[in-house]
Amino acid sequence: MWKGNRRQIDEDFFETPRWAIDPIRKYIPSGVRRIWEATYGGGAIGRVLTEWGYEVVATDKYPKTAETVQHDFLADPLVENCDMLIFNPPFCLKTEFLAKACETGKPFLFICPVTILETRTRFNLFREHQLSVLNLPNRVNYDGGKETEKKKVWFHSVWIMKHPDFKNLILYA
C-alpha cells in the first residue's frame, strides 16, 4: 500500500518535464508496442510515449485524468498485456516500486532521484536484476513543464533501466 495519502493530495506528485523524457526513446526495446505507465498522474510521460507511436496503458492509484484507470501498482494484480513499463514513481516509495518492477520480468524504465543507488536493499536489486542507469545531464525540476513558484522540486535524477541489451551499465544521456 502507498504510504498515507501524500500522492492523493499532491504532496508526492511531481510530473516529469519533456527534456528529461526524450533521452529514453532510444532505450525502448524494438518490438515494444504497448507500454504500461503505472503512475500516469497528469500524463506527462504518457503523452510523449503516445506521440512516439506507442499505445499507453494509463493507470494510477489516484487518477488525475479521464483516461486513467484506478490501479494500485503495489497492491493490485499486474497488467499482463503490455510489453514494457515506463513511469515516474512516488519518490517516497522508490524501493517498493523498484522491487515490484523487477518482479514483473518485463523491461522497464523509471525516473527517480540518484539516491536510488543508495542502500543495501536497492544495491541487491540492481545486482540481481542487472539493472542499468541512464544519467541525465542536469537536475530535473519536476513541474511537468508548468513552471510555477508553488512547486519547484529539483533532483539530480536518473532513469533506472531493465533492458535485454543493456545490463549493469551506467549510460549518459
Question: Where in this protein do the model-derived segments appear?
Answer:
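Class I S-adenosyl-L-methionine-dependent methyltransferase catalytic core
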Residues: 1-173
